[in-house]
A protein has these predicted regions:
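Hydrophobic "anchor" residues on beta-strands that sit immediately upstream
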Residues: 41, 64, 89, 112, ...
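A short acidic, Gly/Pro-enriched loop at the edge of an enzyme's catalytic core
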Residues: 102-112
Length: 184
C-alpha cells in the first residue's frame, strides 16, 4: 500500500515546477514519522501553501487548523485536503495576527504547532505559540539554517519552557517540546 508521501509525489512535482515552497519528500517522511509517533489531536500550521505539509500533518486523524496569507494558495490547499480526505480549517490571513489573537483567548490548546511561513516572522510568533501549545506538546519549525530564522533558533535553544533539538535534515528543522506552563 502506498504511504501518504508516495501519494503526494504528483503534488510535490507540480509544486517544484510552479515554484511553490513545500516541505518535500525527505523532510515530509521525517514529519510523517513524528505525526505517527505523537498522534497529535489538535494541530496548528502556520504557512499552508498548497497543503502539502498539511496533508502530512492531518494524515493520522488530528484536527488541523492551518493559516495561509495567499487566498489563491488557500483555495488550492482546500481542494488538496478534500482530495486526500484531510479535515482542515483553512484560515486566510496573516499567521502572526492569527496566533496573537488566538493566544489572547486560549492557552494549552494545541498538541502540535508546525511553523513554515515567512522566516522573519518565526520569532514574532514564538511566545504566543508557547502559550497555545499544551505542556508536553511540540512546536516544529522548518528551515532552521535560513538567515531569517537565526533569532528564532537561538530563542528556542535557550528558552526555559522548551526542550529543543535541531534536526540536521536538508535545511534543518527544530523540534521543541514544551516542558512547563508556569510563569518563569
Amino acid at each position: 500500500m502506498m504511504n501518504i508521501i508516495e501519494k503526494l509525489k504528483p503534488l510535490e512535482i507540480e509544486s517544484h515546477e510552479r515554484g511553490i515552497p513545500i516541505l518535500g519528500k525527505i523532510k515530509g517522511e521525517w514529519l510523517l514519522e513524528k505525526i505517527k509517533k505523537l498522534k497529535p489531536g489538535k494541530i496548528l500550521e502556520l504557512g499552508t501553501a498548497n497543503g502539502y505539509s498539511g496533508i502530512i500533518l492531518g494524515s493520522c486523524g488530528g484536527r488541523l487548523t492551518t493559516v495561509e496569507i495567499d487566498p489563491i494558495l488557500a483555495e488550492e490547499a482546500k481542494k488538496n485536503f478534500k482530495k486526500f480526505g484531510i479535515e482542515a480549517e483553512v484560515v486566510v490571513g496573516d499567521g502572526v495576527e492569527f496566533v496573537k489573537k488566538l493566544a489572547s483567548q486560549r492557552k494549552d490548546y494545541f498538541d502540535l504547532i508546525f511553523i513554515d511561513f515567512a522566516k522573519k516572522s518565526y520569532i514574532k510568533v514564538l511566545e504566543d505559540c508557547i502559550k497555545l501549545v499544551k505542556k508536553k506538546g511540540y512546536i516544529i519549525a522548518d528551515n532552521m539554517s535560513f538567515e531569517g530564522c537565526k533569532d528564532y533558533k537561538k530563542a528556542v535553544l535557550t528558552h526555559l519552557k522548551l526542550e529543543t533539538e535541531i534536526i540536521n535534515i536538508m535545511d534543518w528543522m527544530s523540534l521543541s517540546r514544551k516542558i512547563s506552563s508556569q510563569k518563569i
